[in-house]
UniProtKB/Swiss-Prot annotation:
Residues where Phosphoserine is found: 167, 181, 362
Source species taxonomy: Eukaryota, Metazoa, Chordata, Craniata, Vertebrata
Signal peptide: none
PTM-bearing positions, type Phosphothreonine: 177
Sequence segments annotated as region (Disordered): 145-193
SMART domains for this protein: ArfGap (SM00105)
Protein localization: Nucleus; Cytoplasmic vesicle
One annotated Gene Ontology cellular component of this protein: cytosol
Protein name stated in the entry: Arf-GAP domain and FG repeat-containing protein 1
Post-translational modification: O-glycosylated.
GO biological process: acrosome assembly; intermediate filament organization; mRNA export from nucleus; spermatid nucleus differentiation
Amino acid sequence: MAASAKRKQEEKHLKMLRDMTGLPHNRKCFDCDQRGPTYVNMTVGSFVCTSCSGSLRGLNPPHRVKSISMTTFTQQEIEFLQKHGNEVCKQIWLGLFDDRSSAIPDFRDPQKVKEFLQEKYEKKRWYVPPEQAKVVASVHASISGSSASSTSSTPEVKPLKSLLGDSAPTLHLNKGTPSQSPVVGRSQGQQQEKKQFDLLSDLGSDIFAAPAPQSTATANFANFAHFNSHAAQNSANADFANFDAFGQSSGSSNFGGFPTASHSPFQPQTTGGSAASVNANFAHFDNFPKSSSADFGTFNTSQSHQTASAVSKVSTNKAGLQTADKYAALANLDNIFSAGQGGDQGSGFGTTGKAPVGSVVSVPSQSSASSDKYAALAELDSVFSSAATSSNAYTSTSNASSNVFGTVPVVASAQTQPASSSVPAPFGATPSTNPFVAAAGPSVASSTNPFQTNARGATAATFGTASMSMPTGFGTPAPYSLPTSFSGSFQQPAFPAQAAFPQQTAFSQQPNGAGFAAFGQTKPVVTPFGQVAAAGVSSNPFMTGAPTGQFPTGSSSTNPFL
C-alpha cells in the first residue's frame, strides 16, 4: 500500500513538471534556446536541452542535471522548480546581459558554447543577486519597452498647422501678381540677345551697297563690298575688281606686266613717230629673269615713258572711282578692248598710231559712279561677241604707224628683230603676226594670232625651240624634235651670258613667228574669236609650227589662248 501511494505521488510530481515544461518561457532551453527541453538543471532550477546538459556537467563545479521523463522528483525539487524556472534564472544569471552589446555565440560550435557557459556560471559575468533580480528585471523591462515602442511604432502624423501654430502666415498659390523685377531682367536679356544676333540682319540687304556706319566688328558681316577695305589701304583696295592695281607698286600701270626697277619696258628702237598703243604693256616680258649682261636689245627710254603714260591714264580716275560702283572698273577694261573699234584704226591689241597716244584710251570719268553696275560687263561681252569688220580684238589691217612693241626698224642693224621689209608691220598685221619678228620670205598662210605660228613654216624661233635645227631666239641651236609640252628650250641654257638676240641675218626669219614654241603643238583651224582660218594656221598662241591635221578642224572654241 505504501508503494502505490509513492507511485501516485511520483505521477503527480511528473504531471506538475510537465505542466511547468509547458509554460511559454520553459519551452526552450535556457542556455541555447532550443525547443523542447528534456533535462532540468537542479542547480539553478532551469530547463535545458540534452546537449547543454552534458556541457553543464563539465563545468566547475559541475551542475546537477536530471532527466524529465526518466527520473523521479521529490516534493522539494518540484517546489524548487516552481519557484525558479527559466524566467527567474534569466533575471539572475543574465540580469546584466545586453542583447545589443553582448555577442551570442554560435551554439553549433561546442567550444563556443562551453566558453559561454563558463562566463555565465563560473565567472558570473552577468549575475545579479536574487534579491535584486526583480528590480533589475523591472528596470530592463521598462527600458526595453520604451525603446521598443520608440523604434517599432511610427509617430503620429500631424498637420503642418499644428506644428506652426495659429500665427503661421497663409500661403497663396497662383493668386498674386508676380514681381516686376524678373520681367525687367527678362526684357533686358532679350535685348542683349537680339543685339548678339544682329550680325545676321544684313543678309537680306544688298551686298554691294555701302553699309550703315557701325562701330562693332559685326557691321560688315557678309558685306563683300568691304571685303578688302581696310583703313590703311583705302587708296589701294577701294575699287573692287580694279585690275589697274596689279602693277602700281613701282609707278607704272602694266596690265599683266611686271613692275620694272631699272629697265625700261621691252621696246625696240624705231625710226620715229609715236610707237605707243593702248595695250603696250599687254604680255609685258620686261621683267623676265635674265643675267646682268643679257638685256633684250637696245631700249628707248623716251618711248617707255610714253608707253607708261599712255596706259597709266586707265588708273587716273582711281580716286574718283573709290566712291563709284564696285564694278565700274570693268568699264576701264572694256574700253581697253573696245577703244577705236568704230573706224579704220585697229582694236585694243593691234591699234595703229594715227591718233595721238593719249587719245586712244577712253578713261571713265566721275559719271561712271551713276552708271549701271553691270553695263561694263555687257559692253565687255559685246566685244567678244561682235563680228570682226576691218579688225578684231587682237589684229589690225591698218598700214599705218607701229605695233604694240614699236615698229620694226628698216635698217638691218643690231636690233632685236632684223627688218626684212621697208614697210613697218603692225602688231598682228597681215604680213606678219609676230610682235618681235618682221615678215621675211613667202608665208605659208597668214595667221591673225600674235603668238601663233604656221605649220612647217618656221625657220627660227623667237623664244622657244625651233624644229629643223634652226637657231633659237637666244642663239642656241636645238636638236630636231617636234615641240611637245615643255621640251626643247628648257633643256638649253635659257639665258646665256653672251649678248641677247644675236644677229641671225643668214637665216630668214619665221614668217609668222614661233612665239612660245615649247608649250605644245598647234591646233590648225580656230582663230582667237572662232573665225576659221586656213588649214595651215595654228590657233594656239603658245604653240609652234607642226604638221596640220592633228586635231579636228571643226572646233568652235572661243578661247583666245587655246
